[in-house]
Amino acid sequence: MEKMKFDTLISSDLGRARETAAVIAEFTGHSIETDSRLRERNYGVLEGLTISEIKAAHSDVLKRLDANDPDYVIPGGESHRQHYNRNIALINELQSGHPGARVALVAHGGVLDSLFRYVANLPLHQPRCYITTNASLTVITRGTFYGTLRWVIETWCDSAHLDGIGQNFGLG
C-alpha cells in the first residue's frame, strides 16, 4: 500500500481491523476513522463457537444458514441482507458525500463479500464462488468504463505482500 494514494482511511471498529489500519496509518500518516457498519456479520448465538459446537447445539440454525436464505435472522444476530444493507449504506454514503475521493477501507471478509455482490450484481442467496483472504488488498474503482459509469473490481484479495510469511485463507 506504500505506493497507493488515498485520501481517507476508514476501519471497522473491531480489534483485528483497527490493528491493521494502525499499521497502514503508520506508513501513510493518515488518521484512522472507524465505522461500525464495516463490522463482520453478527452471528448471534453462533459467535465464538467451533463448528463442532454449532453442529451439536445449533444444528437447526446451521441448516437455515446452509439454505442460503438472505432474510434468515440468526437468533441474537442478523441476516445476510441486514449485513449487506449495512455495508452498502456506508459505500453509498461515501460515494455521495465524497465524490472522487480515494478511500481505503479496512474491514472483514463478509464486507468484501457484500462489496463483490454489489459490484457484480450477484443475488444474496447465491453461494460464494470466490475466496477472501485475510490481510489482502482489494481495489474497487468507480469510473467510466466503456462509456458507462460503474464500479469495477481492479484487484481482488491480492496477498502477494504476504509471500514468505504464511497465509490464512478462509471464506469470510
Regions found by a protein language model. Give the residues of each.
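Generic beta-sheet signal
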Residues: A101-A107
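Amphipathic, non-transmembrane alpha-helical scaffold segments
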Residues: L14, K55, H80, Y84-I88
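GST superfamily/GST-like fold recognition
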Residues: G109-D113, S136
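Acidic, low-complexity terminal tails and accessory targeting/binding regions
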Residues: R41-E53, S96, A101, R117-G172
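Glycine-rich phosphate-binding loop signature in dinucleotide/nucleotide-binding domains
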Residues: M1-K5, L94-A101
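Phosphate-coordination/substrate-recognition cap region in phosphate-metabolizing enzymes
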Residues: M1-K63
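Active-site signature of alpha/beta-hydrolase-fold catalytic machinery across serine-
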Residues: V23, S114-Y118
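Short glycine/proline- and acidic residue-enriched helix-loop micro-motifs
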Residues: V61-Q82
